[in-house]
Amino acid sequence: MKKLLLIATTSATILSSSISFADDMGNEWYLRVDAGAAMFNKEQDKATSVKLKSNTTVPVDLGIGYYIFENFRADLTLGTIIGGKLKASGSATHAPFTGTNVSVSHKPTITRLLINGYVDLTNFDLFDVFAGAGVGPALVKEKITYNGITGLSSNTKNRTNISYRLTLGTSAQIADGVKAELAYSWIYDGRTKSKNVIYQGTSVLTGGMRYQSHNLTAGIRFDI
């Protein structure tokens, strides 16, 4: 938690410096909200070696930012996901569960605070194309469920990771001071904590799941 607060403070300081510069330039600042659909990369469960697939999850971000230059802006966003899971059913291939039919589910809770920068690549009359990148702390934990293996299900505690985001999108002005966005982002949130669970006298390693996702989002920016 201390690490999260330290990184958050650093991110806020960097954004504050950008804001001060933007104020000197007489530029505006904005609020933003984004939501859409996302899917995690395929992963493998450590305890059973069952290969997991993602359902469709809903990413949500709220943020505040400034226009630093005419074609460059920066913002600070707080984001999370709703309803995401990695899951699958199959036959375990990892001892001591080899041959056991099991249904595995990893349900993550992810909260990230990112400082982002965006550059407009082109400026057309009706829309702009932009690219961006972001970095910041993410709190990641998960609930792990095994149906078919009694006593193995568990929860991991929060782990603070460094999260990264790469973005490519387009924006268009829809009203005075209001822009709509459509963007694709790849986000890496790191791994959850690993946990040893005692199963019938044997220590079994669970958790340690890696979360990276492909996101398609729509958003609104309001000048304030």
Curated annotation (Swiss-Prot):
SUPFAM superfamilies the UniProt entry points to: OMPA-like
GO cellular component assignments: cell outer membrane
This protein's UniProt keywords: Signal
Signal peptide start-end: 1-22
Alphabetized InterPro entries for the sequence: OMP/PagP_b-brl, OmpA-like_TM_dom
Domain of life: Bacteria
Entry protein name: Putative adhesin A1C_06425
